[in-house]
Amino acid sequence: MEQQLTFYSYPSCTSCRKTKHWLKAHQIEFNERHLFRETPTREELKYILSLTTEGIDEILATRSQTFKNLNLNIEEMTVNEVLELLIEKPKLLRRPILVDNKKLVIGYNPGELLKLSKKKTVHQSA
């Protein structure tokens, strides 16, 4: 059984709204989770990290004011410390985050969303 697409979003985020509109327009089912009210668990974050190609840099919002205010050197932190930080301060996560059983899309990226759409379409027609 295929895991449904999970869409971590924040309603006032422009990229999240664009992504949600795109998903609906392409009739892709998803389970939306408010990133700050339903923060990803440690296990979910580990899974998201396992799908990245660039590790933490791919999901960390380094340009955010929250990140800048912390004045941290992520490179010196352990994975567990980073996970705890992301759970405590989910604003440090880039958004939106879309994840299913084998695919991860970060941000509004129509090209990547299209790949996700094609994968879903192929699966549904089989």
Swiss-Prot record:
Changing residue 33 to E: Strong decrease in MgsR stability. Strong decrease in activity. The keyword Repressor applies. It holds the Pfam family ArsC. Disulfide bonds join 13-16. PROSITE patterns: ARSC (PS51353). Keywords: Activator, Cytoplasm, Disulfide bond, Redox-active center, Repressor, Stress response, Transcription, Transcription regulation. Activity is controlled at multiple levels. Regulation includes a positive autoregulatory loop on mgsR transcription and a post-translational redox-sensitive activation step by an intramolecular disulfide bond formation in response to ethanol stress. In addition, protein stability is strictly controlled by rapid proteolytic degradation by the ClpXP and ClpCP proteases. The McsB protein-arginine kinase might serve as a proteolytic adapter for the ClpX ATPase in the degradation mechanism of MgsR. Induction: Expression is sigma B-dependent. Induced by ethanol, heat and salt stress. Positively autoregulated. Disruption phenotype: Deletion of the gene results in differential expression of approximately 70 genes in response to ethanol stress compared with the wild-type strain. Regulates transcription of a subregulon within the general stress response. Exerts positive and negative effects in response to ethanol stress. Belongs to the ArsC family. This is Regulatory protein MgsR. It comes from Bacillus subtilis (strain 168). The gene is mgsR.
